[in-house]
Amino acid sequence: MNIRPEIKTAFIVIILGIAIWILLTFPFRYGLDIRGGIRVTLQCQKTEGVEITDDAVRRTIEVIRNRIDQLGVTEPSIYKEGSDKIVVELPGIKDPERALEIIGQTALLEFKDETGKTILTGSALKNAKVEFDQVGQPMVRVEMNPEGAKIFADFTSKNVGKQVFIVLDGKVISNPVIKEPITEGTGVITGRFTIDEAQKLAILLRAGALPVPVKVIENRTIDPTLGKDTMESAYRAGVIGAILVVLFMILVFRFLGLVADIALLIYVVLDLAALKLLNATLTLPGVAGIILSIGMAVDANCLIFARMKEEYAQRKTPMASLDAGFRNALRAIIDSNVTTILAALILFYFGTGPIRGFAVTLSLGVALSMFTQITITRTLLENLLSLPVFKKATKLLGL
């Protein structure tokens, strides 16, 4: 089925317009190595009665994610590494010590009677927030779910005049005396907290206790200026590389090379727009994947043009050389790109963090480069060869 060149050109213009709109509308997500922040590796600890299972690690990740969300950190990255490790990456964070305390604390809250028997745990809480008493001292008001409220009302009704011990991770943080039955399902936790301590406790209680204890085995702080300097160096190198590629393509392939440069620019716009649309996090390995896919796109154009020259040497017309050149080069291009995508999929499956970012940008870039070569590059070349000036001026064309 032959599609008219005008329709193909209109399709390219529409796709390019949408891509430019995406680039101008949506922001990039930058990874830790570019934006700076902290990277913490946690190891789940096996204790008596607690097994380290995939489900336990998954639930631990969810609790940590809830805590981080309440810290107000944008675009955190939390993922499992191995069978018992959790990696937490927090870009752009301003108070890493406080974040580390909130991330790694088990936060098992217990309400105990004077004999040490546990009456309630933090799982009975529905909400926790910071309030202030009459003298401005911060405290944490907790609200219980219906089941917890019923149990606590029954306990306080039977133990008026006795103490209730509020214990966090085995440490008593408050031991008030029960003056009257508490039937509303709310209570306050006092303990000479600072405002930061009260806010931290409220966050921990709202997010819930970690299903398994964790231990910090690695903690790295990444300076944002390092990522900025690296990106500036990569940008300069990219500009210089792009200029050299453009000059090389024009010098070797002349007008064919110029068309390839235009198609390459369109490809870069489509690739960056696709990354933004997928909400992908851009890291330095991801940038490397983009650059590598651009290199593969240039290689494919060189292969197509070399085939076109071979066909033209057999006294074919420029348009017939174009058809035969694409047809003969397509198999090699597809084989090369599919092999690269398979390698990227293996990296994505077995890798973590930055390795996955490299795999995503590489596979996406390679897939888009195939689309660009088959549709955009060919359409641009067909439009070029249809011009009367190039029907005889084949030297200028590059054939």
Curated annotation (Swiss-Prot):
Question: Which parts of the chain span the membrane according to its record?
Answer: 7-27, 239-259, 262-282, 286-306, 329-351, 357-381
Asked whether the UniProt record includes Protein transport among its keywords, one would answer: yes
Look up keyword Protein transport and say if it applies.
yes
Compartment(s) of residence: Cell inner membrane
Q: Name one GO molecular function term.
A: protein-transporting ATPase activity
- What InterPro entries does the annotation carry? SecD, SecD/SecF_arch_bac, SecD/SecF_CS, SecD_1st, SecD_SecF_C, SecD_SecF_C_bact, SecDF_P1_head
Q: What is its main location?
A: membrane
Gene3D superfamilies noted in UniProt: 3.30.70.3220, Multidrug efflux transporter AcrB transmembrane domain (1.20.1640.10)
Q: What is this protein called?
A: Protein translocase subunit SecD
Supply one GO CC term from the record.
plasma membrane
Q: Name one Pfam family in it.
A: SecDF_P1_head
Q: Which UniProt keywords apply?
A: Cell inner membrane, Cell membrane, Membrane, Protein transport, Translocation, Transmembrane, Transmembrane helix, Transport
Domain of life (superkingdom): Bacteria
What biological function has been recorded for the protein in this entry?
Part of the Sec protein translocase complex. Interacts with the SecYEG preprotein conducting channel. SecDF uses the proton motive force (PMF) to complete protein translocation after the ATP-dependent function of SecA.
Q: Known NCBIfam families for this protein?
A: 2A0604s01, secD
UniProt similarity note: Belongs to the SecD/SecF family. SecD subfamily.
Gene Ontology biological-process annotations = intracellular protein transmembrane transport; protein targeting; protein transport; protein transport by the Sec complex
| Complexes and interactors | Forms a complex with SecF. Part of the essential Sec protein translocation apparatus which comprises SecA, SecYEG and auxiliary proteins SecDF. Other proteins may also be involved.
Q: How does it sit in the membrane?
A: Multi-pass membrane protein
